[in-house]
């Protein structure tokens, strides 16, 4: 494993060093100015880059794909975590697969009912880099309720039966690295088996515009396993299309019928994106999304 190292000087602004990310198909993309390179490393699994942008703050990238920026990461992490957390009647034990930056863990730990949160990350260097350079998202790593496991999530979850109240899949892009293992029907079945009878599940399922193939495939596979499967959407400004999809699933809990808005209204921790109105609205899908999912 490569040792973490810091870059000792800022890059000269006149050099105009830019970060380019190409979306699926390589015809559209995102570019960000690099003010300062903070860290760059290569694990056995993937390339890790962390740099500073004047507008977005610290940016975290894996294999050239943006994972988080300081300015907008709350949008993604709050929607991925709080939708399932507020739908479970009393979430005590939570499993997060992926999410090595720590943002989803941070949001899960805002719920006082949580007694244990297991973060299963496949790449130990991501955890090490996040702990050192991504202070905003990795703040829950040392919480006494946190257990960090370095393992392949698809293999790890198979060890459990009827164990977790909530399982959250915070995977990387399925087109590169290890992310594809977390988009299989076998994996979703293992998650189903690891959940308690009243357990709930959520997963990031890509954007429904540029990544329509993966989006549809994830929904199809999850709905084969879980009797209740619902897609919901949220803004995510530095992800492809600016609109991101998540999929909620459960053995019996409905994300609209069983949602109690009073729980959100009475929540005493800071939320910058998620609220009771956003929860309900996020499950209202545009016609083009409904059509792709065969819902109209």
Curated annotation (Swiss-Prot):
Record's subunit section: Homodimer or homotetramer.
Major localization listed first in the record, in broad terms: cytoplasm
Name of this chain's protein: Polyamine aminopropyltransferase
Family named by the database record: Belongs to the spermidine/spermine synthase family.
Organism whose genome encodes this protein: Thermotoga petrophila (strain ATCC BAA-488 / DSM 13995 / JCM 10881 / RKU-1)
SUPFAM superfamilies named among the record's database cross-references: S-adenosyl-L-methionine-dependent methyltransferases
Primary role: Catalyzes the irreversible transfer of a propylamine group from the amino donor S-adenosylmethioninamine (decarboxy-AdoMet) to putrescine (1,4-diaminobutane) to yield spermidine.
GO CC, alphabetical: cytosol
Domain of life: Bacteria
Binding site for spermidine: 77, 101, 170-173
A Pfam family: Spermine_synt_N
PABS domain location: 16-251
């Amino acid at each position: 494993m490569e040792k973490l190292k810091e870059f000792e000087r800022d890059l000269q602004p006149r050099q105009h060093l830019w970060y380019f990310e190409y979306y699926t198909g390589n015809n559209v993309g995102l570019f960000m100015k690099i003010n300062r390179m903070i860290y760059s490393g290569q694990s056995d699994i993937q390339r890790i880059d962390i740099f500073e942008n004047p507008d977005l703050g610290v940016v975290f990238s894996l294999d050239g794909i943006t994972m988080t920026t300081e300015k907008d990461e709350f949008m993604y992490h709050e929607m991925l975590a709080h939708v399932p957390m507020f739908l479970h009647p009393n979430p005590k034990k939570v499993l997060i697969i992926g999410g090595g930056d720590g943002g989803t863990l941070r949001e899960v730990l805002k719920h006082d009912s949580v007694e244990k949160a297991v973060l299963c990350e496949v790449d130990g260097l991501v955890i090490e880099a996040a702990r050192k350079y991504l202070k905003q998202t990795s703040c829950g790593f040392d919480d006494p309720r946190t257990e960090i496991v370095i393992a392949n999530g698809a293999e790890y979850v198979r060890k459990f039966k009827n164990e977790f109240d909530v399982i959250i899949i915070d995977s990387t892009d399925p087109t590169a690295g290890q992310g594809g293992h977390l988009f299989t029907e076998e994996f979703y079945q293992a998650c189903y088996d690891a959940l308690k009878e009243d357990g709930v599940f959520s997963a990031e399922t890509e954007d429904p515009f540029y990544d329509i193939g993966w989006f549809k495939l994830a929904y199809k596979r999850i709905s084969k396993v879980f009797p209740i499967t619902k897609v919901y959407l949220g803004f995510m400004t530095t992800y492809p299309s600016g609109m991101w999809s998540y999929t909620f699933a459960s053995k019996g809990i409905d994300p609209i019928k069983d949602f109690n808005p009073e729980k959100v209204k009475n929540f005493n921790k800071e939320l910058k994106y998620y609220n009771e109105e956003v929860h309900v609205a996020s499950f209202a899908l545009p016609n083009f999304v409904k059509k792709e999912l065969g819902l109209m």
